[in-house]
UniProtKB/Swiss-Prot annotation:
Keywords: Amino-acid biosynthesis, Aromatic amino acid biosynthesis, Cytoplasm, Transferase. This is 3-phosphoshikimate 1-carboxyvinyltransferase. The active site is at D312 (proton acceptor). Its EC number is 2.5.1.19. Monomer. One of its GO terms (cellular component) is cytoplasm. GO terms for molecular function: 3-phosphoshikimate 1-carboxyvinyltransferase activity. Pathway: Metabolic intermediate biosynthesis; chorismate biosynthesis; chorismate from D-erythrose 4-phosphate and phosphoenolpyruvate: step 6/7.
Length: 427
C-alpha cells in the first residue's frame, strides 16, 4: 500500500474508536454475569470480534444491532463446551483472559490463533493456572498456542506474585479467582491498567486493592450492566503524535479514555515539551477531550513504573522521539519483545529504514533526534501498531515514497484509521 507523504499540516476533530481493552472485558463480564448487558460504542476491530465469536461458541447469546451489543449473560457456571476449537485470531488479550475464564469450566477446549499469536508465549498465564488446578498446556516449554485446557469445578485459590508487569496475566488470574472457593491474592510487579478491577466492581463483584496487591474472595456472582466504552487512548496516541510533529497542525480528539493507568503518553508528551491540553474531563467515564498542536520537542528518558502505563504506545512514542532534539532513552520495556512482533527490533528497523537513528537495546531503544525521514518500504509483519506508526511517519516524508506491506493488520484495532487520516489531512 502506498502511503500519503509530504503533508504539511493536519487540522480537524475526530472521535477515536472505543477502547480495545474495555471492549474485550465488556464482552467477558457481560457473558459471565447474570442477566442482560448492553454495550455502547464498542470497538469493532478484529481482536474484539474474535472475543465476541468465542463467547458465542461457548453458548452465549450476543446481538449486534443498531450500534449496541446486547449480551444475555449465562452466569459464572453457564458456559457450554464448544463444538470446535476456539479461534482467538491475533488477540493475545483474548487467549490469555479467556484461559482464566475457562479455568472453572468442567470441559476441555483447544484455543488457537494466527501465525503471530502462535509465536507468543503463554507460560506466563499457564503456570499460575496450573497451580490453581487447571490442566493447560501448549507447544514448547513456553506454551505457545495452540493451547489445550480443561478446567475444574474444584479450582484452588492462589497467592501469586507476577514476575512481569502484565495486565493480561493479572486479569486471567482474577477471572479464575472469581470461580475458586477461598481468597486469592495477586501481587503485581508494577501497577498495570486496571480496567478489570474497575469493571468487576461495576458488575457487582468485590475485591480489595492495596497498592500492587489485589485480593479476590471467591466464588462470586456478577450482574448485567450498561457499559459505555470511551475512546481508546492507544488509538488516540497516533493522532497526538501526528499533531505534535507535523508543522502547522492543530488536532482535537474527543471522548478519549484517560484512566490513570493508561495516560503515560500524556506524561511523556509534557516531558518532551509538547503542547497538549486536557479538557472536558468526565470523572465517571474517565474520558476527556485532548488538543494538540505542532511543537518543538526535546528528548527524554522513559522507564520504570511508567512503562506499563504506555507499553502499547511505545512504537508511536519512538517516532515522536525521532522528531525531538537530543536523545530519548526507552528502558525497562523488554515486554515489547513478546507483543505481536518483537517491537523493539521491528520499530527500529522500520524507522531506521526511513532515516531515523535508533539503536535497539535489550530492554528498549536509544533514539537520537532530530531526523529527516525519507521514503522506504516497511512491512508491518502483521502488527497493527507498526502499520499506524509508519503511516504517521510517512506524513513527514518529502523525499521518496513509503510503501506499507500487510497494511490490513491495522484492522485489528482501528478499522477506520485511514478514513480518519483523510479527514485530518483535508480538515
Amino acid at each position: 500500500m502506498k502511503l500519503k507523504t509530504n503533508i504539511r499540516h493536519l487540522h480537524g476533530s475526530i472521535r477515536v474508536p472505543g477502547d480495545k481493552s474495555i471492549s474485550h472485558r465488556s464482552i467477558i463480564f457481560g457473558s459471565l454475569a447474570e442477566g442482560e448487558t448492553k454495550v455502547y460504542d464498542i470497538l469493532r476491530g478484529e481482536d474484539v470480534l474474535s472475543t465476541m465469536q468465542v463467547f458465542r461458541d461457548l453458548g452465549v447469546e450476543i446481538e449486534d444491532k443498531d450500534g449496541v451489543i446486547t449480551i444475555q449473560g449465562v452466569g459464572m457456571a453457564g458456559l457450554k463446551a464448544p463444538q470446535n476449537a476456539l479461534n482467538m485470531g491475533n488477540s493475545g488479550t483474548s487467549i490469555r483472559l479467556i484461559s482464566g475464564v475457562l479455568a472453572g469450566a468442567d470441559f476441555e477446549v483447544e484455543m488457537f490463533g494466527d501465525d503471530s499469536l502462535s509465536k507468543r508465549p503463554m507460560d506466563r498465564v499457564t503456570l499460575p493456572l496450573k497451580k490453581m488446578g487447571v490442566s493447560i498446556s501448549g507447544q514448547t516449554e513456553r506454551d505457545l498456542p495452540p493451547l489445550r485446557l480443561k478446567g475444574t469445578k474444584n479450582l484452588r485459590p492462589i497467592h501469586y506474585e507476577l514476575p512481569i508487569a502484565s495486565a493480561q496475566v493479572k486479569s486471567a488470574l482474577m477471572f479464575a479467582a472469581l470461580q475458586a472457593k477461598g481468597e486469592s491474592v495477586i501481587i503485581e510487579k508494577e501497577c498495570t491498567r486496571n480496567h478489570t478491577e474497575d469493571m468487576l466492581k461495576q458488575f457487582g463483584g468485590h475485591l480489595s486493592v492495596d497498592g500492587k496487591k489485589i485480593t479476590v474472595q471467591g466464588p462470586q456472582k456478577l450482574t448485567g450492566q450498561k457499559v459505555v466504552v470511551p475512546g481508546d487512548i492507544s488509538s488516540a496516541a497516533f493522532w497526538l503524535v501526528a499533531g505534535l510533529i507535523n508543522p502547522n497542525s492543530h488536532l482535537v480528539l474527543q471522548n478519549v479514555g484517560i484512566n490513570e493507568t493508561r495516560t503515560g503518553i500524556i506524561d511523556v508528551i509534557r516531558a518532551m515539551g509538547g503542547k497538549l491540553e486536557v479538557t472536558e474531563i468526565d470523572p465517571v467515564a474517565k474520558s476527556s477531550t485532548l488538543t494538540v498542536e505542532s511543537s518543538d520537542l526535546k528528548g527524554t528518558e522513559i522507564g520504570g513504573a511508567l512503562i506499563p502505563r504506555l507499553i502499547d504506545e511505545l512504537p508511536i512514542i519512538a517516532l515522536l522521539a525521532t522528531q525531538a532534539q537530543g536523545v530519548t532513552v526507552i528502558k525497562d520495556a523488554e515486554e515489547l519483545k513478546v507483543k505481536e512482533t518483537d517491537r523493539i527490533q521491528v520499530v527500529a528497523d522500520a524507522l531506521n529504514s526511513m532515516g531515523a537513528d535508533i539503536t535497539p537495546t535489550a530492554d528498549g531503544m536509544i533514539i537520537k533526534g532530530k531526523s529527516a525521514l525519507h521514503g522506504a518500504r516497511v512491512n508491518t509483519f502483521g502488527d497493527h501498531r507498526i502499520g499506524m506508526m509508519t503511516a504517521i511517519a510517512a506524513l513527514l516524508v518529502a523525499d521518496g515514497e513509503v510503501e506499507l506491506d500487510r497494511a490490513e493488520a491495522i484492522n485489528t484495532s482501528y478499522p477506520s484509521f485511514f478514513d480518519d487520516l483523510e479527514s485530518l489531512i483535508h480538515g
